[in-house]
Amino acid sequence: MLLCRLLFLECLIVIVDFYFDFLSPFSYLANHRLSKLAQDYGFSIRYYAIDLARVKIAIGNVGPSNRDLIVKLDYLKVDLQRWAELYEIPLVFPANYNSRRMNTGLYYSGAMAQTGAYVNVVFNAVWGDGIAPDLESLPALVSEKLGWDRSAFEDFISSDAATERYDEQTHAAIERKVFGVPTMFLGDEMWWGNDRLFMLENAVGGAPVNGE
């Protein structure tokens, strides 16, 4: 009887998979909104930090990035500020976009059962405060906020194990046909972009679909 009840409850759990790269301002916006939706609708978020450059190359997207297209970048900065104002959060561009080290840190936070907190802290530092993701002191700042052993965290993000896990998750994302960030999945349904979150909200509000 207890087993049946547990299986029934498991089927009611709604899980949204969230693929992101800390270099992405649109992922920062999406993370903020997705966290609010998770509170409102009671679903769980499964986080995946991936290498956006590798994902784009995998589908043949080898053109210049938005950062290299000055006219487009000028517009995107305006658009991003509009979204930030809508969400009532700050948005400050960092000095660079070298996100690999902090991306790998997600897989340390998983062992600490603090993935959501880690993602929020790093996004707020990089895009809320404009701190460069490769700033030498950023791991110490994150460790302090989360109550972690700084040395253990720094050792992990410099380890081969962290790189292997990061590469594995990026490859798995490519296999799942992820081509950009932010990308969200509810079951087999995929949405790409911060501006598609209203569609995800409609889906979450209408069906008890688990993410397995």
Curated annotation (Swiss-Prot):
Q: Where are the transmembrane segments?
A: none
Tell me its cofactors: glutathione
Which positions are catalytic residues? Answer: 24
Q: What is the reaction catalyzed?
A: 2-hydroxychromene-2-carboxylate = (3E)-4-(2-hydroxyphenyl)-2-oxobut-3-enoate
Q: Would the keyword Isomerase turn up in this protein's UniProt record? A: yes
What is its EC class? isomerase
Q: What is this protein called?
A: 2-hydroxychromene-2-carboxylate isomerase
What organism does this protein naturally occur in? Pseudomonas sp. (strain C18)
